Amino acid sequence: MITVSCIGFLTGVGLNGSGFAMGVQSTSARDARVGVPRAMVSRSALCALSATEAVREATRHHRSGGNGFVIVTPTGVQVVETSAAIDDVTEERPWGAHTNHYISNKFQTVANSAAESVQRLEEAVATLGGVSDRELMERARFLVQSPGFVPRSPDRSVVTAFVMLADLGAGSVQTAPGGGERGPWVRVNLP
């Protein structure tokens, strides 16, 4: 699994000791409400005892807003999208990806979505398919450095981002700076 995130928003990104990895991005919808904050929902999903339980945690009612989750197990990937009131969960499949804009048509009535972001996601998925881990790591870092891939503040300053590659078989996570930064990949093994 590869995930790209901004430093400081890492509550639900990582490798779980129960054998799954998860990436998450906030989504924007018009049905936001008072409820459990998205960061707490994503953290609860990452701390679940299984990928199935992570899906349940991600889709619990009483959410204040939504996220796009990518939950990866050794057998496949599920994409889970939520708004405050709506959720959509894909069947397990070999590949999955998400951006901070809704992909599922189920959210058309509430989404504040941008087609350009979804198009970049589809291009990234096509680019990353069928490559070695090393090539995948370099391509992921390159994608993060691509114009328009990393979100920017209104004054157009660069947001610090990182790339994470989770290897479920080895029980490890490798991470490196993205967003124009160069640096070594650092590997962390689960105990």
Question: What positions do the PLM features span?
Answer:
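Short amphipathic C-terminal alpha-helix that caps PH/PH-like domains
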Residues: 39-45
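C-terminus-biased signal that marks the final domain/tail of proteins
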Residues: 45-191
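A contiguous strand-loop segment
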Residues: 1-38, 52, 64-66
